A protein has these predicted regions:
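Glycine-rich phosphate-binding loops of nucleotide-dependent enzymes
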Residues: 1-165
């Protein structure tokens, strides 16, 4: 699929009039323009050709397209599961910047990650789980990464205030 096709999957725009209504022809120019605008808004200017196949993109660019797709259509929340896994340092940086940009637009993000530096860099709150259950909720400015890891491993027990959160 092209980048534009990927962004519009399940939300394709039809041509106006009889061609779209009866013959169900897609309005590709409108889809491409919208996709280009949304990628540009999020600073994904490294993607030159909107008709480029997604599988030819780098891992960071693919994640960027996925984030742009979620942000472009007024999602109430964006859920990202290990968005920086298997990415290089530069690509991870770019994905974290995209997360900040989307969050700045007022869209809540649920980030599932084992990469503690990334979590502490972008999170407002961190839900720590241990043995399949939520153990506590902490704010990154109040705790260190070492504290968070200690909670996860059971080396440290959170205070009652964090557990109740």
């Amino acid at each position: 699929l092209s980048i534009a096709d990927n962004m519009f999957m399940g939300r394709e725009l039809r041509k106006p009039g009889i061609m779209g209504k009866w013959f169900r022809q897609l309005d590709r120019p409108a889809m491409e323009k919208f996709a280009r605008e949304k990628l540009s808004e999020l600073g994904l200017m490294t993607i030159q050709n909107i008709n480029q196949a997604v599988e030819t993109l780098s891992g960071g660019q693919r994640q960027g397209v996925a984030v742009a797709r979620a942000a472009a259509f007024g999602s109430k929340v964006v859920i990202l599961d290990e968005p920086t896994a298997a990415l290089g340092v530069k690509e991870s940086r770019r994905v974290l910047e995209l997360i900040r940009d989307v969050r700045a637009r007022g869209i809540p993000i649920i980030l599932i990650s084992h990469n503690m530096p990334h979590v502490f860099e972008v999170a407002d709150r961190i839900h720590i789980h241990r043995l399949g259950s939520r153990l506590c909720v902490i704010r990154p400015q109040d705790y260190s990464m070492s504290d968070a890891v200690a909670f996860m491993t059971g080396a440290k027990v959170p205070e009652a205030a964090e557990v109740a959160a």
